[in-house]
Amino acid sequence: MSLRLFEIDVPDAALADLRGRLARTRLPPDEADDWSAGMNPAYLRELVEYWRSGYDFRAREAELNALPQFRATIGSTAVHFIHARGVGHAPLPIVLTHGYPDSFLRFLKLIPLLTDPAAHGGDASDAFDVVVPSLPGYAFSDPPQRGGATFNIGELWHKLMTNELGYARFAAHGGDWGSTVTEHLARSHPAAVIGIHLTDVPFWHAFQKPHTLSAAEKRFLESIEQFPRTEGAYAVIQGTRPETLAQGLNDSPAGLLAWIVEKFQRWSDCGGDVESRFTKDELLTNVMLYWTTQSIGSSFQPYYDLTHANVVRWMLETAKTWIHPVKVPAGFALFPKDLSHPPREWAERFFYVKRWTQMPRGGHFAAMEEPELLAEDIREFFRPLRGHAAPHA
């Protein structure tokens, strides 16, 4: 086994450099106080000043280091992850996979609700052993190699859960890129995965063109086709010229802050007020993970993979077999302010759908916005499947 304990330890010099850069921030003269054209200039100024003079990274670092963090080298890739043990008899192991532009921080509010449900108004028999890896190229995980590595992360997760942690069978949950990784994991290892729970249908299925579509499916795919023109410019540039963008964001903390925080405002159920869902500290700590690890460029890799010619060919070939549903049970929790709103019949083309929940509120960052709603849906979905999990090795 290659497991080793991990603690975040950002050098003092790196924090001093950051404060200097923030003090020298040169923002455009625009004083607008709205989000209509992207990042709100007035709010960016406010955030930059708080980051420079009010935000206490060392306090946040200490909070994160109170979590059981590890790194494991799997093949040639070192993977960072949290491994939080459940409270009670025979907790069900589950791997939670985040997306972009967040990090393992997505699940911090969810972890205690899953590991110790009895302490939060739930049933102790619903407890989970929770594993939260950082995607390759995010935070403290090694970057992936180019050329389709995004679609091999499921293999890393399988080895992490079985070889490194000793779980013969386990559950999986994900959203955004996490849903793609979770699907691949379940398709490749149905004997190990007892079920999957997702907050979206992986975007890449839009490349598949079934001959017959319901009216709802047609509307959904039409909305997907509009996405690059209405909301998806970030994905286009990250998928075609990631290095160009990364040069600027890796050098400018204010630029990085704007690029990431704007998505938290746009994609959450915040009614226009991003701080109604996320505190300044939550927003900044997520950005700090990108800044201190210089991982914004490597976080773009899945987008580059998705648009790379070889990967597209791989996807089209894979589609011939992946048109059939995943063999393991799947549950979906759909949040109204997320980026896409697929109908159930679209999901049923690719998944063995056993649960479909339309949530009353919440957005793309559901585990941060509505952790209680998400936790309860995960508990209920996996409750009848618990007998299929093998004891911990």
What do the predicted segments below correspond to?
Residues 14-86, 90, 282, 291-294, ...:
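Non-catalytic accessory segments flanking enzyme active sites
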Residues 102, 238-393:
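C-terminal subdomain of alpha/beta-hydrolase-fold enzymes, centered on the catalytic histidine
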